[in-house]
Swiss-Prot record:
NCBIfam families: trpG_papA
Organism from which the protein derives: Leptospira biflexa
Protein name as catalogued: Anthranilate synthase component 2
Catalytic activity of the protein: chorismate + L-glutamine = anthranilate + pyruvate + L-glutamate + H(+)
Gene that this sequence comes from: trpG
Alphabetized GO MF terms: anthranilate synthase activity
Domain Glutamine amidotransferase type-1 intervals: 2-201
């Protein structure tokens, strides 16, 4: 299996690389795990590399700004049929903007905040416990009323600050999912299970 982590210049990318590497080793099959920054290679190069899975990392800034999101937007627009794509934090916000939704400033910025979520139990959430606590580092959120019909909400904050805020999105016809929180953080319960679901799907 050949997996790409597209790095949006985020400090969590190393955590992501480590955990995904462990998951790939569990499979006991040959694999290649690459990390490429969002301005390091042109989209056509990434497309021709024929990755089996692509993860779009967290990062600073707004996903509508190419200076922050780079080639990530092209990947979401062009590669969602094959291969499957998972967007994390900025990656999920990019999902919302690329497909026509809005990403706006949250009422309360979250920097290292644990929150419980409710989820639909499908896709990357398959087999995960309801009410798990997840780690949040974000000041932007997807605006629900703006989301296109192509996207469905898969998870929300279930209690506390930011209750009801969107924590997961899935494209209805493309193999694209996103989570607003950080499954690669040690503070997120069952985060490795979520990433394993994506890799093994």
């Amino acid at each position: 299996m050949k997996v790409l982590i597209l790095d949006n210049y985020d400090s969590f990318t190393f955590n992501l690389y480590q955990i995904v590497g462990e998951i790939l080793e569990e499979r006991e099959k040959p694999f290649q795990l690459d990390v490429i920054r969002n301005d390091e290679k042109p989209f056509e190069w990434i497309k021709s590399a024929n990755y089996d899975k692509i993860i779009i990392s967290p990062g600073p800034g707004h996903p509508a700004d190419p200076a922050y999101f780079g080639v990530s937007a092209d990947i979401l627009k062009e590669l969602g049929k094959t291969p499957p794509v998972l967007g994390i934090c900025l990656g999920m916000q990019g999902m919302a903007t690329v497909f026509g939704g809005e990403v706006v400033r949250a009422n309360i910025a979250m920097h290292g905040k644990l929150s419980p979520i409710e989820h639909d139990g499908k896709g990357v959430f398959s087999g995960l416990t309801q009410g798990i606590e997840i780690m949040r580092y974000h000041s932007l959120v997807a605006k629900e009323i703006s989301l296109p019909n192509d996207l469905e909400i898969t998870a929300r904050v279930s209690a506390g600050e930011g209750k009801g805020e969107i924590m997961g999105l899935r494209h209805k016809s493309l193999k694209i999912e996103g989570v607003q929180f950080h499954p690669e953080s040690f503070g997120s319960e069952e985060g490795k299970c979520l990433l394993r679901n994506f890799i093994n799907s």
